[in-house]
Amino acid sequence: MIKDIPQEKVTNVAIAVVQEGEDWNVYLVNLKDTPLENVLVSSKGYITHENGSQTKTSELRHALGNVPPKSYAKIEPIIENVFGLHNQYWVTYFSDNQLLDKKYIFLAETIKEENFVKIPILNKRGVMIL
């Protein structure tokens, strides 16, 4: 039964973490030629330490509404204290009447200047997962 459901892959949708002055912000970037409709994003941070203990943040949910083609939407501010955690963003949206979702994970200690790239559409530098 599940094999009968088409498994479309998410393409041309990115999550970017950008430093803006003293602040850091997380953005959803729509590189597609079509809008993303009813966008929902779930975000959380987590890590399991060598001794087995876990550190977790609260899970936050964001309703971004529609994101036009070739544009972006701010998801949330992020603080440097959580860069030592894996930061997960689970994006769900409709595109061409199809429900799509993708999980983006910034691994611990990867949000740093040496990993910066130019973020398309946003025209700023930051860390991006496509």
PLM feature segments, named:
Residues 1-21, 31, 103, 109-110, ...:
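Low-complexity, acidic Ser/Thr/Pro/Gly-rich terminal tails and inter-domain linkers that flank the onset
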Residues 23, 36-38, 88:
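Exposed beta-strand and adjacent loop surfaces of beta-rich binding modules
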Residues 25-32, 78:
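Short edge beta-strand/loop segments characteristic of extracellular beta-sandwich folds
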Residues 76-130:
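Terminal connector regions
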Residues 33-50:
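Short acidic, flexible loop segments centered on an aromatic residue
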Residues 49-86, 96-97:
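Intrinsically disordered, low-complexity Pro/Gly/Ser/Thr-rich segments with frequent PxxP/GP/PP motifs
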Residues 29, 41, 105:
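Surface loops and adjacent helix of pleckstrin homology
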Residues 9, 23, 58-61:
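Residues that act as N-cap/strand-start positions at coil-to-secondary-structure junctions
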